[in-house]
C-alpha cells in the first residue's frame, strides 16, 4: 500500500485554493526585509497605474519611472504605447531590479538610487542635457523618507524634466508628498 503524501503547493494556489499572487509575495518578502525602503505592503494596482498613466503629457515619449517594483507601472506605460527604448526604470532593490530585467528585457532598467537620478539619466545616455524627459512617474513612498532624501529625489526629478514636463507621484497619506 502506497502512502503518498500530498505535495506542498509552490505554484499558483494557496492551501485554501485561492490564487497566490507571485508578484505580491515577492514584493511582501522585500518589505519584510526592509519595510522603510519598501514603504508599502503590496505592489500598486493596475487601476492606480491606469490613473497615473492618464496624467502623462500629450505626446510623451521619454519617460522615467522611479521605484519600478514588480512592473505594474512599467507594463501600463508599455500598454499605453511608450516604446521600451524610451522608458528608463530606476529600482533600488536588487531582487526587484532582476525581476524587472527578466520581465522587460527591452526596457532600460537600472539598479540605482532615485537620489542620483540626474547622474543615472545622463550616465545612461537616455536623454541629453538639453532635451530632458517628458515625464517622471513615481511610486516611491516619499512620505516615509527623511526630508533630505525627499529633497534630493525631487531636485533630481526637476533637473531631468524638460520644460513643460510632468512629475506624476501618488501617495497614501494625509499630505502631499511634494510641497
Question: Where do the language-model regions lie?
Answer:
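Class I SAM-dependent methyltransferase Rossmann-like catalytic core
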Residues: 22-58
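Conserved class I S-adenosyl-L-methionine
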Residues: 60-69
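Conserved SAM-binding loop of SAM-dependent methyltransferases across substrates and taxa
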Residues: 70-82
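Conserved SAM/SAH-binding beta-strand->alpha-helix loop
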Residues: 93, 113
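Conserved SAM-binding loop
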Residues: 100-101
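A short SAM/SAH-binding and catalytic strip from SAM-dependent methyltransferases
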Residues: 133-148
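A short glycine-rich, Lys/Arg-flanked "PGG" loop and its adjoining helix->strand segment in the class I
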Residues: 151-163
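Conserved beta-strand signature within the Rossmann-like core of class I S-adenosyl-L-methionine
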Residues: 164-172
Amino acid at each position: 500500500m502506497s502512502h503518498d503524501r500530498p505535495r506542498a503547493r509552490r505554484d499558483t494556489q494557496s492551501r485554501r485554493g485561492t490564487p497566490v499572487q507571485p508578484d505580491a509575495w515577492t514584493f511582501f518578502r522585500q518589505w519584510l526585509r526592509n519595510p522603510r525602503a519598501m514603504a508599502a505592503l503590496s505592489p500598486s494596482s493596475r487601476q492606480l497605474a491606469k490613473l497615473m498613466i492618464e496624467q502623462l503629457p500629450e505626446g510623451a515619449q521619454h519617460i522615467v519611472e522611479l521605484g519600478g517594483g514588480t512592473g505594474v507601472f512599467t507594463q501600463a506605460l508599455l500598454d499605453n504605447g511608450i516604446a521600451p527604448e524610451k522608458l528608463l526604470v530606476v529600482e533600488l532593490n536588487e531582487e526587484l531590479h532582476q525581476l524587472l530585467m527578466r520581465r522587460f528585457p527591452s526596457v532600460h532598467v537600472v539598479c540605482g538610487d532615485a537620489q542620483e537620478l540626474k547622474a543615472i539619466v545622463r550616465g545612461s545616455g537616455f536623454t541629453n542635457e538639453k532635451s530632458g524627459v517628458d515625464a517622471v512617474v513615481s511610486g516611491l513612498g516619499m512620505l516615509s523618507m527623511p526630508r533630505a532624501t525627499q529633497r534630493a529625489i525631487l531636485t533630481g526629478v526637476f533637473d531631468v524634466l524638460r520644460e513643460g514636463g510632468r512629475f506624476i507621484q501618488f501617495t497614501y497619506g494625509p499630505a502631499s508628498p511634494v510641497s
